[in-house]
Amino acid sequence: MEPLQQQQQQQQQKQPQQPLLQMDAREKQGPQTRESQFLYASKLGTQPALLSITPGRPSGSSVLGPLARVPPATPVARMSEQSNVNSEPEEEEGGLEDEDGDDDVAEVAEKEAQAASKYFHMQKVTRQEPRATPMSSLLPVPGLSPQGQQTKEDHTKDASKAPPSVPTAGQPSWSLDEQLKQNGALAWSDDADGGRGREISRDFAKLYELDGDPERKEFLDDLFIFMQKRGTPINRIPIMAKQILDLYMLYKLVTEKGGLVEIINKKIWREITKGLNLPTSITSAAFTLRTQYMKYLYAYECEKKALSSPAELQAAIDGNRREGRRPSYSSSLFGYSPAAAAAAAAAAAAAAASAASAGTPALLSSPKIRFSILGLGSSSGTSASSPRIPPASTLRKGDGVPVPVPNRLAVSGTLAGQQAGNRPGPLEHLRERLESGEPPEKKASRLSEEEQRLVQQAFQRNLFSMARQLPMKIRINGREDRAEPSAPALNLTTSNIGSINMSVDIDGTTYTGVLFAQKPVVHLIAGSTPQSIGSSASSSNSSSSHCSPSPTSSRGTPSAEPSTSWSL
């Protein structure tokens, strides 16, 4: 019995102690739970306010910043520890507490668990969104007056604008530059664009104020409105030679001259440059003015005055390009203009005549004329046929190549001066053709023909005088590809200055001899028959060298062939 009584007494002594312990635990837990609930409610209440403060945030981002990830003072953990400590003696006592106490403790535990789960859920969300702004300092702290809270909120607003001084471990530090790059980068570009815009507006203002012409403002307004409606607005004023290009004056000058196409065809851009007061040292001023006019003013010209069409403009530009690539006519032949060609031809003929009369050889060859081998017809009967001069080849670009004097020339067997009197004077004929209204290309080709004809005559007149000075061989009608095998051939070789070794091949018979020069003008009398040759030899009064036939004659004997004489 005694042990039972002792147990009952102990239980009675412990029973008044248990309500005291429960009351102490409740008194300790009450303010802590209220504090945790107040903190959680304040967090939930600040969420819409933060969302309204940061409108640029995405909808799914968290509003709590990196500093909110650190639990403030962890009251929930302390309460759980105290509840565990307080529950240990209750479990040891065998659960003799009253039902009301158990219900209260269970409700408190459930609320604490819910608060803790929601708190840790918010912590996970903030970890997933690292760009959250540090707003934990905006949470109200119990124990502070409303004025203190307001001052603290003001400080936190200033702090939120400045970068955090000490970033938390594992959290990125967000500086002011990065925030400007992400959210305020447009402000910098707007400022730069604003500077350029102010510059452009100043250019427009200067364009309006270049002079006091009352039509300037009306024209510029109409031009800008037209280009805006056309879909190609003028966003900037062109600059030329470090000054604003006066669009009004450019349009006025061009339209007064007949329009853009007319100026391109006439090539009078220099007058436009002077009218705009631009320096004459500008390179490619014509091209620059043309491109600027086409870009800013040509459509307006077509709309208002219709001086030309885009097709005509393109044709004018293409023609200008072709003329730019084409070489000038003054340098195509002799380096001087075609108008002076007649005078040059006359000078060449006079030089040839003076050289022939004075006995001095003159090589009249233009350095840029191509000479063709002259073909000659065979002489038949007593009359000599006129020389056959092949038509001159057409003059093309690049034909003016210097040609050396050929060592073998085909010349006429009769005097060139005799045939020169039978046809009209080349200079008069050339002058008539130049004075006629022919295109320059045809004039150039005809000029080349006349020049070649004059030079051929000069060579015929000075044949033997050149042979005396130059060691050369001249073969007359000696082309191997001739269809007439009976054509006479003449080979001349200079042995010294005063004599010429001559070899004539007539109808297969070769005649050789030495010619001694006595007169500068050579009269070459050649007959097709031995009788004509003999008569010419008998009529000769001057001293002559008789040509003896070669032993390789294919017709007759040397004694049967009469001797031929050449009068010098």
Swiss-Prot record:
Subcellular location: Nucleus
Disruption outcome: Embryos die before 11.5 dpc and display various abnormalities, including wavy neural tube, small branchial arches and defects of cardiovascular system.
GO molecular function: DNA binding
Region annotation (Disordered) ranges: 1-174, 378-403, 529-568
Asymmetric dimethylarginine: residues carrying this PTM: R370
Domain REKLES residues, every copy: 425-522
Domain ARID: 213-305
Keyword vocabulary terms for this entry: Acetylation, Developmental protein, DNA-binding, Methylation, Nucleus, Phosphoprotein, Transcription, Transcription regulation
Listed Low complexity bias regions: 1-22, 529-559
Basic and acidic residues: compositionally biased ranges: 151-160
Any one GO CC term of the record: nucleoplasm
InterPro entries: ARI3A/B/C, ARID_dom, ARID_dom_sf, REKLES_domain
Any one GO BP annotation for this protein: positive regulation of transcription by RNA polymerase II
Interaction with ARID3A as annotated region, ranges: 495-518
Residues that bear N-acetylmethionine: M1
Pfam families for the chain: ARID
Acidic residues bias: start-end ranges: 88-107
Signal sequence region: none
List of residues that carry Phosphoserine: S87, S309
Region spans: Interaction with RB1: 201-374
Top-level taxon: Eukaryota
Function per UniProt: Transcription factor involved in the production of cranial mesenchymal tissues. Favors nuclear targeting of ARID3A.
Assembly and oligomerization: Heterodimer with ARID3A. Interacts with unphosphorylated RB1.
Name of protein: AT-rich interactive domain-containing protein 3B
Origin species: Mus musculus
